[in-house]
Amino acid sequence: MRKIIHVDMDCFFAAVEMRDNPALRDIPIAIGGSRERRGVISTANYPARKFGVRSAMPTGMALKLCPHLTLLPGRFDAYKEASNHIREIFSRYTSRIEPLSLDEAYLDVTDSVHCHGSATLIAQEIRQTIFNELQLTASAGVAPVKFLAKIASDMNKPNGQFVITPAEVPAFLQTLPLAKIPGVGKVSAAKLEAMGLRTCGDVQKCDLVMLLKRFGKFGRILWERSQGIDERDVNSERLRKSVGVERTMAEDIHHWSECEAIIERLYPELERRLAKVKPDLLIARQGVKLKFDDFQQTTQEHVWPRLNKADLIATARKTWDERRGGRGVRLVGLHVTLLDPQMERQLVLGL
């Protein structure tokens, strides 16, 4: 049985700012773009979250909820330096590390001899070491599979951890809401609830063939996760090539204004996700995806050096006009392709 740890730093960007400037610790702060430039919030500290300020929220809305919010532009070199230090701490315990972003990673400690092989104690020691060396707090989840470790890391935030032992998995899954499973969004959760499926325990009683007919390959993933099955390895060679966000509508849309409004809502989340893996927002390409009511889909991309909302909207409009053919649209997606590290190095050297 594997021993997987998911480590997730607590409000990472904001925590670095509070560490380096203690005067910020007890006041609401957020990292994000200015209201004048229609920026979005990347991270907010816990005092700000008490006012409802959240990641991916437009800065203007955040300031309405919390007028005395201290807005910081972000110091991504400092965040990267802290992230590298955290990664080095992980490497003291295992070489099997899969970074997901600057502030979270999976660790496979199945074969680790540290702490007498106890994943629970390893997670505790890693969190304590991070605090001792960086004065930052982390939360962790421990489980036999990746998706449960990720869910567990959110159970006792901030500065806590949660353990799901192999023996506890069946009982934990019985009452686990499907919306907690990574990849199950609001629309999917609503469709599942309409079918009477609210928890993993409900899905365990379902026929796999029915789920496959209704949801395609997602149906298999849903069934497997509900059984506690997740055979994905912690991939230390993992190199993220793209970042995306999409929305499946409860009802098909037929007017460009509806599509544009969805893009306006999706863009802040894309920006937030990209900032977690690529703080400078430099990219190779960006593009849009539309899926139609006949389940055909189309993707169109542009070579573009930096994330740009105006270009995404223009690309989507061109795709809407030229490829829709009068069909309803059931899904709108935005994505970026990241620069190849070797190409990025050449660009930097060229400067």
Swiss-Prot record:
- UniProt keywords, alphabetically: Cytoplasm, DNA damage, DNA repair, DNA replication, DNA-binding, DNA-directed DNA polymerase, Magnesium, Metal-binding, Mutator protein, Nucleotidyltransferase, Transferase
Documented effect of changing A310S: In strain: ECOR 57B2, ECOR 59B2, ECOR 60B2 and ECOR 62B2
Q: Cofactor binding mode, per the note?
A: Binds 2 magnesium ions per subunit.
List of catalytic residues = E104
Q: Name the family the entry cites.
A: Belongs to the DNA polymerase type-Y family.
Residue ranges annotated as transmembrane are none
| Binding positions (Mg(2+)) | D8, D103
Entry note about domains: The catalytic core consists of fingers, palm and thumb subdomains, but the fingers and thumb subdomains are much smaller than in high-fidelity polymerases; residues from five sequence motifs of the Y-family cluster around an active site cleft that can accommodate DNA and nucleotide substrates with relaxed geometric constraints, with consequently higher rates of misincorporation and low processivity. It lacks the O helices present in high-fidelity DNA polymerases in the fingers domain.
What is the protein named? Answer: DNA polymerase IV
**Upregulating conditions:** By SOS response. A member of the dinB-yafNOP operon. Induced by hydroxyurea.
The job of this chain, per UniProt, is described as: Poorly processive, error-prone DNA polymerase involved in translesion repair and untargeted mutagenesis. Copies undamaged DNA at stalled replication forks, which arise in vivo from mismatched or misaligned primer ends. These misaligned primers can be extended by Pol IV. Exhibits no 3'-5' exonuclease (proofreading) activity. Overexpression of Pol IV results in increased frameshift mutagenesis. It is required for stationary-phase adaptive mutation, which provides the bacterium with flexibility in dealing with environmental stress, enhancing long-term survival and evolutionary fitness.
Q: Where in the cell is it found?
A: Cytoplasm
Enzyme Commission number(s) from the entry: 2.7.7.7
Cross-referenced InterPro entries, in alphabetical order? Answer: DNA/RNA_pol_sf (IPR043502), DNA_pol_Y-fam_lit_finger_sf (IPR036775), DNA_pol_Y-fam_little_finger (IPR017961), DNA_polymerase-Y (IPR050116), DNApol_IV (IPR022880), IMS_HHH_1 (IPR053848), Rev_trsase/Diguanyl_cyclase (IPR043128), UmuC (IPR001126)
Q: What is the effect of changing R49 to A/F?
A: Loss of function
Q: What is the effect of changing D103 to A/N?
A: Loss of function
* UniProt-listed Gene3D superfamilies: 3.30.70.270, 3.40.1170.60, 5' to 3' exonuclease, C-terminal subdomain, DNA polymerase, Y-family, little finger domain
Q: Which residues form the UmuC domain?
A: 4-185
Residue ranges annotated as coiled coil are none
Enzyme kind, highest EC tier: transferase
Instruction: Say yes or no: keyword Nucleotide-binding present.
Output: no
Which GO cellular component terms are attached?
A: cytoplasm
Q: Name one GO molecular function term.
A: DNA-directed DNA polymerase activity
Q: How does it assemble?
A: Monomer. Interacts with beta sliding clamp, which confers increased processivity.
Q: Which HAMAP family match?
A: DNApol_IV
Phenotype when changing R225C? In strain: ECOR 59B2 and ECOR 60B2
Protein's organism = Escherichia coli (strain K12)
